[in-house]
A protein has these predicted regions:
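Active-site catalytic loop in hydrolytic enzyme cores
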Residues: 88-177, 181-191, 253-261
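Short beta-strand scaffold segments in enzyme catalytic cores
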Residues: 83-85, 95-99, 129, 222-224, ...
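Extreme N-terminal starter segment of soluble prokaryotic enzymes
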Residues: 1-4
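Residue-level detector of high-confidence beta-strand sites
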Residues: 108-110, 234, 243
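Short polar catalytic/cofactor-binding loops
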Residues: 7-14
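CN hydrolase (nitrilase-like) catalytic-core segments centered on the catalytic cysteine
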Residues: 66-80, 147-240
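Cys-nucleophile CN-hydrolase/nitrilase-fold catalytic domain and related Cys-dependent amidase chemistry
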Residues: 14, 22-102, 170-194, 199-202
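C-terminal/domain-edge helix-coil "capping" segments
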Residues: 257-271
Length: 271
């Protein structure tokens, strides 16, 4: 199976975002990609900063049943595609992810963990649930969710062997490095991807935005991480696809052959 994480910029204008999603998906299908994970805020971009709305304004919002998702499902065809947008639901807004193919929606997730200031744009989700897909049982994390070990552990405990991490992760706002690869947030972004994969012995497909939005400069660094925490493919700070070929079930099973972290947990000692 071939899995891929997208590293690209998605701005405020919806139609160019949709066209870019369609073009990247078509290219990935030609390249034999079975699972394609896009960054956070794929439709309409992320915030331009934390706190005040700023000059970039709020991202556009769509309900979960908007016809735009029929268009994107048609573009996905046989490929399993994960992407993200600002969801509107009865006057509330969520940072949401959807997983779909040409047959329709396979699963959804609303971002649970919010950095300071994000409450101005989004309400918080309240659960982590894995679901079955043609490429295996999968769970989704949006951006800051992956900072918290319990989030990925909950999905792994629910049977997920693949974690799709959709991010709009920026460089540090307070201590910027001259190069993105040297930035403190770049190191943390990589650390979380590798740690969540290794501690749960799952495959992590981590996508991130590039470019800038308002005050935020996004890191890129999309990657595929194996269940031992090893990086199998990455884009570094550039736009592109991080692609890796692997038998997910076999790799996960092999990583758990001698040490099985989920089986050997002692939750009664953690209280």
């Amino acid at each position: 199976m071939r899995v891929a994480a997208v590293s690209a910029h998605f701005g405020r204008d919806v139609e160019p975002c949709l066209a870019k999603i369609e073009a990247i998906t078509a290219d990935a299908r030609v390249r034999g990609v079975d699972l394609l994970v896009f960054p956070d805020a794929t439709i309409g971009g992320y915030l331009g900063g934390f706190g005040a709305v700023g000059a970039t304004g709020m991202p556009p919002a769509f309900p979960a049943d908007d016809p735009v998702f029929d268009r994107l499902a048609a573009a996905a065809g046989p490929t399993v595609v994960c992407l993200s947008w600002r969801e509107s639901d009865a006057g509330r807004f969520f940072n949401s992810a959807v997983c779909l193919t040409g047959d329709g929606v396979l699963g959804r997730h609303r971002k649970v963990h919010q950095p300071v200031g994000e409450v101005a744009a989004y309400a918080a989700g309240d659960r982590f649930t894995a679901f079955d897909t043609p490429v295996g049982r999968l769970g989704m994390l949006v951006d800051y969710d992956k900072t918290f070990p319990e989030a990925a552990r909950t999905l792994a405990g629910d049977g997920a062997q693949l974690l799709a991490c959709l991010s709009a992760w920026p460089a540090s706002l307070t201590d910027r490095a001259p190069r993105l690869a040297q930035d403190r947030q770049s190191r943390l972004f990589d650390l979380y991807d590798c740690a969540r994969a290794a501690e749960n012995q799952v495959v992590v497909v981590s996508a991130n935005q590039t470019g800038t939005m308002g005050r935020l400069r996004f890191l890129g660094q999309s990657k595929v991480v194996g269940p031992g925490g090893d990086v199998l493919a990455r884009t570094w700070a550039k736009a592109g696809l991080a692609c890796a070929d692997l038998d997910v079930a076999a790799e996960v099973s092999r990583s758990r052959l001698n040490l099985s972290h989920l089986r050997e947990r002692r939750p009664e000692a953690y209280a």
